[in-house]
């Protein structure tokens, strides 16, 4: 089996990041190239890991389900910036597959991959699908 370019996208909390990191390690062990999209919270969680086994793309993201019109507008703008950044990275080096692990930072990369015709897989570790994975 030849090595594949596999991108992953995960929210900025441990419940999203650490399952994604486990999949990254398994994919790397099989010789695949991996990249992980997350927000600055996820990057901060991973900052303490020496020899991080994945290329990290930190994108802008926020929940659009906040209270207050101004917060929703700002969150929508952040998601838009995350989508543009995702379009740049995914369009530049088309992955063979994108795996989403939920959380708002995963929404834009997964959506962009889907729009570009990249096959998408979703990993849901909870009993019910979250908003981003739905």
Map each language-model feature to its residues.
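A short, glycine/small-residue-rich beta-strand->loop->alpha-helix junction that serves as a flexible
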Residues: 8-21
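Short beta->alpha connector loops at strand-helix junctions that form conserved
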Residues: 58-62, 101, 122-126
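Conserved nucleotide-sugar phosphate-binding/catalytic loop shared by glycosyltransferases and other
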Residues: 3-11, 28-78
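Structural detector of well-ordered beta-strand residues that form the stable sheet scaffold
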Residues: 7, 35, 98-99, 121
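An aromatic- and histidine-rich active-site surface loop
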Residues: 41-46, 95-116
């Amino acid at each position: 089996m030849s090595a594949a370019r596999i991108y992953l996208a995960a929210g900025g909390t441990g419940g999203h990041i650490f399952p994604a990191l486990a999949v990254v390690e398994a994919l790397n062990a099989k010789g695949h190239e991996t990249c992980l999209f997350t927000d600055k919270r996820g990057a901060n969680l991973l900052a303490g890991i020496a020899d991080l086994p994945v290329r990290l793309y930190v994108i802008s993201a926020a929940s659009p389900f906040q209270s207050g019109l101004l917060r929703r507008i700002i969150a929508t703008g952040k998601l838009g910036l995350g989508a543009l950044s995702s379009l740049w990275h995914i369009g530049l080096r088309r992955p063979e597959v994108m795996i989403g692990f939920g959380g708002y930072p995963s929404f834009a990369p997964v959506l962009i991959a889907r729009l570009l015709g990249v096959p998408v897989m979703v990993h849901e570790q909870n009993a019910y699908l979250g908003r981003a994975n739905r």
